[in-house]
Design a protein with these regions (language model features):
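Active-site loop-to-helix "anion-binding N-cap" substructures in soluble metabolic enzymes
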Residues: 8-168
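Positively charged, low-complexity/disordered segments
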Residues: 1-9
């Protein structure tokens, strides 16, 4: 089943064949941290149904999220998603690899089923809804999935431009 929307076609999770596909999933894992520990995992746990559905279909996953409000284009350790990657690793009892670069040859290299892109707000063009960044994000996998309802109101590269430019 699919319905038409202004930006692109919208597919229901159960209707799309994701078997053995590379999925880029925009999630909302903007969680509170203290001393590199996740204080409240509610938003991470909200993403579990999509992650589990993908893994049960032998899909590989690259998660994209933001954390806090870093200066765009600059790495700030206090906004790193490393603690979130560690939390996900513990949840699934397998390593969730943190990816630091969009050019990384490690993306979907077959070594890890779940990967997490470093804080999307570290990348130039996220907040300005850069079409260039959106195109790069959309091209990283076979399917771009939006599962970040809490960020749906933001017109940013990972929540808007990537969706417009994704094939599926």
């Amino acid at each position: 089943r699919r319905s038409s929307s202004a930006a692109s076609d919208v597919y229901k999770r159960q209707s799309l064949d994701i078997t053995d596909k590379n999925l880029v999933i925009r999630v909302d894992m903007n969680v509170p941290l203290k001393d590199s520990e996740v204080l409240d995992a509610t938003r991470i746990k909200a993403c579990l149904p999509s992650i589990e559905h993908a893994l049960s279909n032998n899909a590989r996953i690259l998660l994209i999220s933001h954390l806090g409000r870093p200066s765009e284009g600059n790495f700030e350790e206090k906004f790193s998603l490393q603690p979130v990657a560690e939390y996900i690793s513990n949840l699934f009892n397998e390593k969730c690899e943190l990816i630091n670069s969009l050019e990384s040859k490690d993306i979907f290299n077959g070594k890890f089923n779940v990967q997490l892109l470093e804080n999307i707000r570290f990348f130039e063009g996220e907040k300005s809804n850069s079409a260039k960044l959106g195109k790069i994000l959309a091209s990283l996998g076979d399917i771009y999935v939006f599962d970040a309802f809490g960020t749906a109101h933001r017109e940013q590269a990972s929540t808007h431009s990537a969706i417009e430019q994704a094939n599926i």
